[in-house]
Amino acid sequence: MPGNSFGKLFRITTFGESHGPAVGVVIDGVPAGLPLTVEDIKFELEFRRPGRLYVSGRREKDEPEILSGIFNNRTTGSPIAVIVRNTDVISSFYDEIKYKPRPGHADLPFIMKYGYENWDYRGGGRASARETVSRVIAGAVAKKLLMLTDTWIAGHLRSLGPEELSEEVTFEEVLCSKYSPVRASKKDLEEKYEALIKKATQEGDSYGGIAEVIAKNPPIGLGEPVFDKMKAELAKAIMSIPAVMGFEYGLGFIASKMKGSEANDEIIRKNNRIGWKYNYAGGILGGLTNGEDLIVRCAFKPTSSIRKPQKTIDLRNLEESYISVIGRHDPAVAIRGVTVVESMVALTIVDHAMRAGAIPLVKLTEDQANTIQQRWERYVKSCKPMEESQS
């Protein structure tokens, strides 16, 4: 099974299955001298952890164990290996799935490709969103390293089912959405999302949603003009996330309905520099970052594992049958998916920042390490519940 790695200079390889002993990641290319602790990783993991309100009831603590690459809370320059053990596994929930592939899930394609006898049906195996724990671990390292360029990354849920954000949102509000149980950036929207989730849970159904992620102050000129355009790299990164169905940046698909005179973003003097009036391009022009905020959105489909009965094929007799999926599944995978999108954006930007020379390849100076730590502490403090930010 190839295709388990991402990145060129900052390269990650994820491993593990949903109901295996552990999931984990090997991160290659992190320069020596980066201040990094288990707490730094746990800070990001907490926002995708199951067992909380409105998400999967699977009670995982998601405690990261660092196996290599860090000594005295500093990276050594060697590969960083981190695992998270799977401690709340109930494989009996998947006994029926062994014979009845779930509609909307990867079950049947995996059987077709790898063979029924080789298919790990427990929790979806490698196709499970549990794999994204590894991405968030790596994303935490990438986010901290990006503090060297003062690039901050945060996301929120722009829509959930039929409900959507209808007003402008500040980056500070997006940061605060981390502590919203439904990743809403506005209090009234949070209440609407919560009502939808309760409804879906009662009906044994699920909802999809749109995640929006903003990267503030990315280095200028990241990406390449042809095949390695920043938009192409981000699209690949984000579309690799389970349940993601679509990707856009800036104006996105709305631009197809506009005139050139409307969609062209006027170039102006902006904060004593040359900039763009509205950032319609979402921070990317010609495949290169242009100094404006990088803004991307992606669509998550509704969680495919639902209690509502749906038609499938019983593989024991190849007759049509029905399946009602029991177990502990998210009523909206998009909620926890926001953190995963943030991580993939961070991994893409940090890899290109290293390619462009904006981040050292071998080691950080003491001044650089101190700057990173100070900015990281400020970032962590800035991520706080809406109520605290308004007080």
UniProtKB/Swiss-Prot annotation:
Pathway(s) of this molecule: Metabolic intermediate biosynthesis; chorismate biosynthesis; chorismate from D-erythrose 4-phosphate and phosphoenolpyruvate: step 7/7
Zinc recorded as keyword: no
The keyword Transcription regulation appears for this protein: no
Keywords: Amino-acid biosynthesis, Aromatic amino acid biosynthesis, FAD, Flavoprotein, FMN, Lyase, NADP
Cofactor(s) needed by this chain: FMNH2
Residues binding FMN, per UniProt: R126, A127, S128, G286, K301, P302, T303, S304, S305, R328
Pfam families given in the database record: Chorismate_synt (PF01264)
Binding site for NADP(+): R48
Signal peptide: none
EC code: 4.2.3.5
Disulfide bonds: none
Co-factor remark: Reduced FMN (FMNH(2)).
GO biological process: amino acid biosynthetic process; aromatic amino acid family biosynthetic process; chorismate biosynthetic process
Cellular component GO terms, alphabetical: cytosol
GO terms of molecular function: chorismate synthase activity; FMN binding
Job description of the protein: This reaction introduces a second double bond into the aromatic ring system.
The family this protein is said to belong to: Belongs to the chorismate synthase family.
Protein name per UniProt: Chorismate synthase
Lineage of origin: Archaea, Thermoproteota, Thermoprotei, Sulfolobales, Sulfolobaceae
